[in-house]
């Protein structure tokens, strides 16, 4: 095969992944809805994985802080072998049930434990999910095998059957891509339902550098239609926090009142704006949850 034929083959196989993921979406939606309720009650999300699965979990958890300003410790990735295994393969650690149990020792009843294993039988993940079941945590399994050995340990089975890999057994390929898509969809839908977006905008993002500070201004302009100068003035009054500035501009109220409304409604912009505008009839429950609404 020519090099072009090789990469075309890989790409053709990758194109099948989205369809495999689609089969797991009903289970994923149920997981998100139940996870939202648990997180509102003080629960945390814990990912457990080894090898590629663990690395993907670490990536997803790490990205939530800058994207949605999720406090550290709210979404936690447990990678078999720890930090050193992120850059140097440590394949043997995935075989330890006890290591998985140890990693899961901090789980509480209101938490959510999500195991990731392409094979559906990784002992490290099995140990973690066993502890999760013992304490009453919500459990889910992300895998490539619909008949996964660990399926009985999960309240929600997210099985994306991606089929044989281009390189037999190399689950970092299609199976890994499917896991990444499911993680993206889970964490993003979770943040939407928790009110950390407004329309399709990242209104809870953490602006930690020049690029992101510029993005905050543009997001505020896009959401409100104000000029660059007005947006910057509003952000200055809100100490750079996007949500209070947004409610201030959209509701025509002072920044402190905007902060108070947001605090009263768990940071959900739609609910804060609804109270600022007074009682309304026919407001959708999805708006109260901070779900996607038409762009403004």
Kindly give the residue locations of the regions a language model identified.
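Cofactor-/ligand-binding subdomain signature composed of acidic, glycine-rich
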Residues: 1-20, 24
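Catalytic, metal-anchored helix/loop core of enzyme active sites in primary metabolism
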Residues: 7, 11, 36-39, 48, ...
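Gly-rich Lys/Arg/Thr-decorated short loops/hinges at beta-loop-alpha junctions or inter-strand turns
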Residues: 9-17, 77-87, 198, 239
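Short, glycine-rich nucleotide/cofactor-binding loops
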Residues: 17-26, 115-122
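A short, well-structured juxtamembrane/interface segment
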Residues: 23-38
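Glycine-rich phosphate-binding loops that contact phosphosugars or nucleotide phosphates
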Residues: 45-194
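Short, amphipathic alpha-helical interaction segments embedded in low-complexity terminal/linker regions
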Residues: 185, 190-296
